[in-house]
């Protein structure tokens, strides 16, 4: 069986923990992760001035698809950049059409709203993004730290990044693998 594949879309202003933790956890689980720079392959300055080097440009990574999951990190500016991107819209629409998993954290779910993805789903976001996400009646809101409704998986913020990442692993490769990855991380239960 071929290993599962993940596309993490990295935009300027993305939240560092919400990018790096899911990438790390998915790679520990044997998922082939591509970090794709929205604006190209150049290093990306994140919300707290950490710089991350993408594996590929989004344009190049798109050619290597499809992916089992598309991941959207949060960060206000990062989410805004994802929301304004026609390329992100195209990738998300394609992922939704082929019934692939879409995972977004913190302010990242606002890009789902902007691109009309997963309407009717139950979602969660960072508390500061709730009002924007609930503008209209496109989603129902959950206060859960991680919420999965069908093929839409959302989470609340930096402090839920491990839970979010482990849920992606569980969905893609199973709870047993997620538990094996979790054990050496020494997370609080």
Swiss-Prot record:
The modification N6-succinyllysine is found at residue 182. Deglycase activity does not require glutathione as a cofactor, however, glycated glutathione constitutes a PARK7 substrate. There is a cross-link at residue 130 (Glycyl lysine isopeptide (Lys-Gly) (interchain with G-Cter in SUMO)). The modification Phosphotyrosine is found at residue 67. Keywords: Acetylation, Autophagy, Cell membrane, Chaperone, Copper, Cytoplasm, Endoplasmic reticulum, Fertilization, Hydrolase, Inflammatory response, Isopeptide bond, Lipoprotein, Membrane, Mitochondrion, Nucleus, Oxidation, Palmitate, Phosphoprotein, Protease, RNA-binding, Stress response, Tumor suppressor, Ubl conjugation, Zymogen. A lipid is attached at residues 46, 53, 106 (S-palmitoyl cysteine). The active site is at 106 (nucleophile), 126. Its main location: membrane. It holds the Pfam family DJ-1_PfpI. GO terms for biological process: adult locomotory behavior; androgen receptor signaling pathway; autophagy; cellular detoxification of aldehyde; cellular detoxification of methylglyoxal; cellular response to glyoxal; cellular response to hydrogen peroxide; cellular response to oxidative stress. One of its GO terms (molecular function) is peroxiredoxin activity. The modification Cysteine sulfinic acid (-SO2H) is found at residue 106. The modification N6-acetyllysine is found at residue 148. It catalyses: N(omega)-(1-hydroxy-2-oxopropyl)-L-arginyl-[protein] + H2O = lactate + L-arginyl-[protein] + H(+); N(6)-(1-hydroxy-2-oxopropyl)-L-lysyl-[protein] + H2O = lactate + L-lysyl-[protein] + H(+); S-(1-hydroxy-2-oxopropyl)-L-cysteinyl-[protein] + H2O = lactate + L-cysteinyl-[protein] + H(+); N(omega)-(1-hydroxy-2-oxoethyl)-L-arginyl-[protein] + H2O = L-arginyl-[protein] + glycolate + H(+). It comes from the Eukaryota. Its EC number is 3.1.2.-, 3.5.1.-, 3.5.1.124. It is an enzyme of class 3 (hydrolase). It is found in: Cell membrane; Cytoplasm; Nucleus; Membrane raft. It is a lipid-anchor. The modification N-acetylalanine is found at residue 2. The record marks 149-150 as: Cleavage. NCBIfam families: not_thiJ. Multifunctional protein with controversial molecular function which plays an important role in cell protection against oxidative stress and cell death acting as oxidative stress sensor and redox-sensitive chaperone and protease. It is involved in neuroprotective mechanisms like the stabilization of NFE2L2 and PINK1 proteins, male fertility as a positive regulator of androgen signaling pathway as well as cell growth and transformation through, for instance, the modulation of NF-kappa-B signaling pathway. Homodimer. Binds EFCAB6/DJBP and PIAS2. Part of a ternary complex containing PARK7, EFCAB6/DJBP and AR. Interacts (via N-terminus) with OTUD7B. Interacts with BBS1, HIPK1, CLCF1 and MTERF. Forms a complex with PINK1 and PRKN. Interacts (via C-terminus) with NCF1; the interaction is enhanced by LPS and modulates NCF1 phosphorylation and membrane translocation. Interacts with NENF. Belongs to the peptidase C56 family. This is Parkinson disease protein 7 homolog. The gene is PARK7.
């Amino acid at each position: 069986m071929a290993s599962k594949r993940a596309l993490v879309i990295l935009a300027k202003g993305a939240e560092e923990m919400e990018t790096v933790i899911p990438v790390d956890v998915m790679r520990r689980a044997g998922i082939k992760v591509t970090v794709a720079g929205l604006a190209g392959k150049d290093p990306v300055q994140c919300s707290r001035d950490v710089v991350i080097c993408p594996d590929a440009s989004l344009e190049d990574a798109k050619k290597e698809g499809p992916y089992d999951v598309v991941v959207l990190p949060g960060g206000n500016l990062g989410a805004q950049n994802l929301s304004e991107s026609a390329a992100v819209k195209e990738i998300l629409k394609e992922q939704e059409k082929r019934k692939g998993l879409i995972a977004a954290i913190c302010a990242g779910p606002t890009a789902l709203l902007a691109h009309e993805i997963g309407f009717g789903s139950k979602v969660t976001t960072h508390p500061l993004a709730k009002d924007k996400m609930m503008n209209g009646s496109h989603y129902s809101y959950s206060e859960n730290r991680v919420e999965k409704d069908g093929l839409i998986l959302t989470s609340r913020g930096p402090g839920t990044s491990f839970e979010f990442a482990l849920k992606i692993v569980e969905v893609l490769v199973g709870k047993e693998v997620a538990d094996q990855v979790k054990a050496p991380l020494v997370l609080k239960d």
